[in-house]
């Protein structure tokens, strides 16, 4: 897996990050809830027209991302347990598409002409040619993207991507099969 630094500027993004939970909470509040996790998804979908009138379109589509992403996370977990790499990559890609289209955390709304993460995602998809998968990483808004690159394409991918995103922007990561562990100091 590569992490690609797309050289986005995070210095003025506090309002963009804060808008995501605020808008999701506005949808929850319409139903008398504090958080979307307290709301059954089917109730949300049955009341879309009313929710749009009382919140905003962006709040509604961000709430949709919340509901679908939680289901997708369970499916991704199952795919990993079953070592189904193809299904994992498909779900990973769908998650990325949902972030782009519904969560809308790829570029700041006040700067539509500067989209370094969008360009990096476009380039990654093109370079992968239908293999592997890519998506925004972390909280989004242009910092880094994650890219699963087949081993036989890794060097070429990095070379071509760095022509677009800059020298030393591609970082190859290794993922341990054991997950997080606690390191303890030997007390002698």
Feature roles, as predicted:
Residues 1-135, 147-188:
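C-terminal nucleotide
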Residues 142-145:
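N-terminal pre-core extensions flanking Radical SAM catalytic domains
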């Amino acid at each position: 897996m590569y992490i690609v630094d797309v050289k986005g500027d995070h210095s003025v993004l506090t309002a963009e990050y804060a808008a995501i939970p605020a808008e999701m909470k506005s949808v929850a509040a319409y139903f008398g809830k504090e958080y979307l996790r307290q709301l059954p998804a089917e109730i949300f979908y049955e009341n879309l027209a009313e929710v749009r009138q009382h919140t905003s379109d962006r709040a509604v589509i961000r709430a949709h991302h919340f509901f679908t992403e939680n289901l997708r996370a369970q499916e991704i977990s199952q795919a990993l347990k079953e070592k189904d790499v193809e299904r994992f990559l498909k779900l990973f890609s769908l998650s990325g598409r949902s972030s782009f289209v519904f969560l809308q955390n790829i570029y700041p709304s006040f700067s539509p002409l500067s989209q370094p993460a969008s360009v990096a995602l476009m380039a990654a998809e093109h370079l992968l040619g239908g293999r592997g998968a890519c998506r925004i990483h972390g909280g989004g808004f242009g910092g880094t993207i994650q890219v699963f690159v087949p081993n036989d394409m890794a060097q070429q991918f990095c070379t071509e991507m760095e022509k677009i995103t800059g020298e030393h922007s591609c970082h190859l990561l290794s993922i341990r099969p054991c997950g997080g562990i606690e390191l303890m100091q030997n007390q002698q």
